[in-house]
UniProtKB/Swiss-Prot annotation:
Stated name of the protein: Cbb3-type cytochrome c oxidase subunit CcoN1
Annotated pathway: Energy metabolism; oxidative phosphorylation
Residues reported in the UniProt entry to bind heme b 2; high-spin: 345
Lineage of origin: Bacteria, Pseudomonadati, Pseudomonadota, Gammaproteobacteria, Pseudomonadales
Subcellular localization, as worded in the UniProt entry: Cell inner membrane
The EC number(s) this enzyme carries: 7.1.1.9
Organism of provenance: Stutzerimonas stutzeri
Membrane topology type: Multi-pass membrane protein
Originating gene: ccoN1
Family: Belongs to the heme-copper respiratory oxidase family.
Note on cofactor: Binds 1 copper ion per subunit, denoted as copper B.
PROSITE patterns: COX1, COX1_CUB
Length: 474
């Protein structure tokens, strides 16, 4: 028995995280559709504090970023680090702890946020006891990941692991520094920082939660699963190394662009803007590297919907990372800030890049860890692809139109200097966009239900003996 386990990959924790990625994806995106409907039809708030938009919106963001995105990152990093190091996970019991610990974090978030327990910091709303639990789980994750790298059977550390490693270390630093707080009761604390300093620390964290959790981590996924699915080596390995160092050097500086025209010192705003513009180069370097990996394999897109998911995610990544630096320019930001354009930009990255690359990776990974040849139905993957693409496009386009309309209406003034439009008029103009956004989100959500069915049928058909056979190290 011991011999078998020592020569078999630790796939159990990968299977658990993969299944929970789909589950939390449905929960988080279902919540997203519901709060989108609340904006279109406010009576859906039901006049209850627990179901109000203000409490459910942070629950939605935490569910899709940390529950769906987090589980996807755990599953794919645990899978690819074993494969690229040709060794089993370091401390499999600790890896099991990261699974149960992370699910507990998600559960506590799902209970505390609707009850109104919040630090009020975006993407870091969870109160201090949960912050401590996150830190403990994250340290365990780092030990497992870097421990596995340390006992690798190959000399080289694959580039995907560099991205996963940077994501794990940076998120740890961001989480600890931004959540330094003084507890006053069991579920209430106050930030250690005040005023503009607090805002700066918050958006250094907030932007780099995007930069490292939702970008570097998912680039780790891209660098493993795109070459695997295309059956081609990375287009330029040298470019991938340059991409890595350039990205992690520049990204950490870009946070102030969230605070243009605020009390933040002007030099800090300008620095954030310049760094955001520089960021275009490494971002597009990575996107081009991923796309060009398909050189000689473009024909596969006709018959392989999994590869289509991965390639379209790269296209959305390219689009989002062009749009982000553009929106960081102060003159553009004067129009876009506080409007739905920002929401559209975020979802170009969240639905188009993060969700699509995760879905593509899961469709590749699930059959591998459950000992199946492929997913239950390739046709259903194709259906999911079109639902996801159409849903994303509707979502983004409606928010672009809304955002630019809002920005123009808010700044329009009459000859005597009074505002041309009242806020309510801009809200009325936004209503059709709210409805289209909800429809786009619902279409994307329908795709997740298709994925859940396909995954369930694939898992149901697998036998425990097949799991073991699939986990054997060749």
């Amino acid at each position: 028995m011991n011999t078998a386990t020592s020569t078999a990959y630790s796939y159990k924790v990968v299977r658990q995280f993969a299944i929970m990625t789909v589950v939390w994806g449905i929960v988080g995106m279902g919540l997203g559709v519901f709060i989108a409907a609340q904006l279109a039809w406010p009576f859906l708030n039901f006049d209850l504090p627990w179901t109000s938009f203000g409490r459910l919106r942070p629950l939605h963001t935490n569910a899709v970023i940390f529950a769906f995105g987090g589980c996807a990152l755990f599953a794919t990093s645990y899978y690819s680090v074993q494969r690229t190091c040709q060794t089993t996970l370091f401390a499999p019991k600790l890896a099991a702890f990261t699974f149960w610990g992370w699910q507990l974090v998600i559960l506590l978030a799902a209970i505390s946020l609707p009850l109104g327990f919040t630090s009020s910091k975006e993407y870091a709303e969870l109160e201090w006891p949960i912050d401590i639990l996150i830190t403990i789980v994250w340290v365990a994750y780092a030990v497992v990941f870097f421990g596995t790298l340390a006992k690798r059977k190959v000399k080289h550390i694959y580039v995907g692991n560099w991205f996963f490693g940077a994501f794990i270390l940076t998120v740890a630093i961001l989480h600890v520094v931004n959540n330094l707080e003084i507890p006053v009761t069991a579920m209430k604390s106050y930030s250690l920082y005040a005023g503009a300093t607090d805002a700066m620390v918050q958006w250094w964290y907030g932007h780099n939660a995007v930069g490292f959790f939702l970008t570097a981590g998912f680039l780790g996924i891209m660098y493993y699963f795109v070459p695997k699915q295309a059956e081609r080596p990375v287009y330029s390995y040298r470019l991938s190394i340059v991409h890595f160092w350039a990205l992690i050097t520049v990204y950490i500086w870009a946070g102030p662009h969230h605070l243009h025209y605020t009390a933040l010192p002007d030099w800090a705003q300008s620095l954030g803007m310049v760094m955001s513009l520089i960021l275009l180069a490494p971002s597009w370097g990575g996107m081009i590297n991923g796309m060009m990996t398909l050189s000689g394999a473009w024909h596969k897109l006709r018959s392989d919907p999994i590869l289509r998911f991965l390639v379209v995610s790269l296209a959305f990544y390219g689009m989002s990372t062009f749009e982000g630096p553009m929106m960081a320019i102060k003159t553009v930001n004067a129009l876009s800030h506080y409007t739905d354009w920002t929401i559209g930009h975020v979802h170009a990255g969240a639905l188009g890049w993060v969700a699509m690359v995760s879905i593509g990776a899961l469709y590749h990974l699930v059959p591998k860890v459950f000992g199946r040849e492929q997913m239950h139905s390739i046709g259903l993957i194709n259906t999911h692809f079109w639902l996801a693409t159409i849903g994303t496009v509707l979502y983004i386009a409606s928010m672009w139109v809304n955002g630019i309309a809002q920005g123009l209406m808010w700044r329009a003034i009459n000859d005597d200097g009074t505002l041309t439009y009242s806020f309510v008029e801009s809200l009325e103009a936004s209503h059709p966009g709210f409805v289209v956004r909800m429809i786009g989100g619902a279409i994307f959500f329908a795709g997740m239900l298709v994925m859940a069915y396909n995954t369930w049928r694939t898992v149901q058909a697998a036998k425990p003996a097949e799991y073991d056979a699939a986990a054997q190290i060749a």
